[in-house]
Design a protein with these regions (language model features):
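Short, flexible, glycine-rich and Lys/Arg-enriched loop motifs at helix boundaries
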Residues: 33-42, 332-340
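Short amphipathic recognition helices of helix-turn-helix/homeodomain-type DNA-binding modules
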Residues: 1-29, 40-144, 428, 446-453
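A general structural signal for alpha-helical elements within enzymatic catalytic domains
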Residues: 31-35, 71, 201, 329
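Conserved binding/catalytic microenvironments
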Residues: 4, 149-463
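Charged, solvent-exposed alpha-helical segments that act as regulatory interaction surfaces
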Residues: 39, 75-79, 330-333, 416
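Short amphipathic alpha-helical interaction patches enriched in hydrophobic/aromatic residues
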Residues: 16, 34, 53, 176-179, ...
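Short, well-ordered amphipathic alpha-helices
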Residues: 26-34, 196-197
Length: 463
């Protein structure tokens, strides 16, 4: 993976400005404090500060010394994360566990965003940890309410700040649907690290404002996790989704919690972990029931049904799908959060088609996959998914020419996207068609897939 350019550090610049401290002044005070503490090896000057402002991460103990110097000048504690520098002692499980205290949630997520911006080895090499998923779901279900979001910093957070986060989240979500997660990930991460982290750490907020801020952060963190998942960065995605769930708990937002748990179930299914997907889906259902949206509950039910299908449990899958259909029949748009607008009859049909595909019921899969194509044209990636799904059903029906015709439509859309999932679904289709390599259309299509799609990203094959 190519290294991203080093990000500048506006937070350090802002703190130096607030403290009225020059580059030379900061360097001199850092050296003096190091000597006073008996740390003789610290050497820095104004050019060192210029490098820090450009995004360089100094080695320990320099970040802690900078924080102490600026804290003394400002008359308040300055944590290392507020400097725009990642603490040097990041734990290997950063972001994998669900915190319950607001201060812990802010510190963990800010450190996660900063480490991701800096492409720290911890996250570049982050693996998906299946054992961490049920623990988060259990904690969501059984823990007492999380602490209320409150900040006492110098920056007043108001309604306009929260609406700005939500507006940008909506814009990013629309772009994600049209372009795929790869093009969006850096933009979303930069906004989280540069702007949202600043509000959380330095903001003054409490009560309803604090809860609304937590909910907005949860929505954006969930989207950040989703685009990382779509980009094939599953270990990073898992950490973002877990922290998004923490923000939903602090906000007391059961609907958002259900959506995030369903997203975690979605990822678990993709990574062939159906047991964990079922557990997460059931936790999501509990949250959805507390909110009261029948549409949201339907989403959580079909995720559970897909988990049963992936385990080849046709009976449990059928029972759960029937419950999902009855639930959706009584759904109304008035019950739904704005971010749930994507879930409609076409989306439900696609989820059902995936269940029947995994159960080996090709005719049912094809019928529902065709229904799924009666969808909103703004969801380009979703259409690519559904076309690949229909093509896969045709392949299972032993109709290789039809599979290649529909698969080529999916391929034409996929090459416009930066979506590891979309590319992998096409490769999976080509793999399923391989036994019919005697058919000219199959040979042509599989060759075109190899030629037009980039090298495979590092992620597991979908079910």
């Amino acid at each position: 993976m190519p290294q991203r350019p080093r990000a500048a550090n506006p937070r350090l610049r802002a703190l130096m400005g607030e403290a009225r401290m020059s580059n030379k002044g900061l360097a001199r005070r850092v050296v003096d404090l190091a000597k006073a503490r008996g740390v003789a090896h610290v050497r820095c000057d104004h050019t060192s500060v210029l490098r820090w402002l450009a995004g360089e991460q100094p080695r320990p103990p320099v970040p802690e010394l900078i924080a102490s110097v600026l804290g003394d000048a400002l008359g308040r504690p300055v944590p290392e994360i507020e400097l725009g520098m990642t603490p040097s002692d990041l734990p290997a499980d950063l972001g994998l566990h669900l915190p319950t205290e607001w201060g812990d949630t802010v510190a963990i997520s800010a450190a996660l965003w900063r480490a991701d911006v800096q492409r720290r080895r911890l996250l570049v090499n982050a693996a998906f940890v299946a054992a961490a998923m049920p623990a988060s779901a259990l904690r969501w279900l059984t823990s007492p309410p999380a602490s209320a979001p409150a900040g006492s910093g110098p920056v007043r957070v108001g309604h306009a700040d929260i609406e700005a986060i939500r507006d940008l989240t909506l814009s990013y979500r629309e772009l994600d649907n049209r372009l795929g997660g790869g093009r969006l990930r850096t933009m979303i991460l930069s906004y989280l690290d540069d702007h949202v982290s600043h509000l959380l750490i330095n903001g003054s907020y409490r009560g309803d404002t604090g809860q609304q801020l937590a909910a907005a952060c949860g929505e954006l963190s969930q989207l950040a996790g989703w685009v990382a998942y779509d980009s094939g960065e599953h270990g990073v995605a898992q950490r973002y989704l877990t922290q998004a769930l923490a923000y939903a708990r602090h906000a007391g937002d059961h609907a958002l919690g259900a959506e995030i748990l369903a997203a975690q179930a979605h990822q678990a299914l993709y990574l062939t972990r159906p047991g964990e997907a079922i557990d997460l889906s059931r936790a999501a259902q509990a949250a959805a029931l507390k909110h009261g949206s029948a549409t949201l509950l339907t989403e959580c039910l079909v995720m559970e049904a897909h988990g049963h299908a992936a385990r080849d449990d046709a009976s449990a899958c059928g029972t759960t799908l029937a419950t999902a259909e009855r639930t959706f029949d009584r759904a109304t748009q008035e019950d739904n959060p704005a971010w749930l607008a994507y879930f409609d009859e076409a989306y439900l049909a696609a989820r059902m088609a995936q269940c029947f595909r995994d159960l080996g019921e090709a005719d049912h899969a094809a019928r529902y996959a065709r229904r799924s194509l009666d969808m909103d044209g703004r969801y380009v990636r979703g259409r690519a998914f559904n076309l690949a799904l229909l093509a896969t059903a045709h392949a299972a029906q032993n109709e290789p020419e039809r599979a290649c015709t529909v698969g080529r439509q999916a391929l034409d859309l996929t090459v416009r996207l930066t979506s590891a999932r979309s590319a992998h679904y096409l490769r999976d289709l080509a793999r399923r068609l391989r036994p019919r390599a005697d058919v000219p259309a199959v040979r042509d299509f599989t060759a075109e897939v190899r030629e037009r799609l980039p090298a495979a990203a590092g992620h597991a094959a979908p079910r």
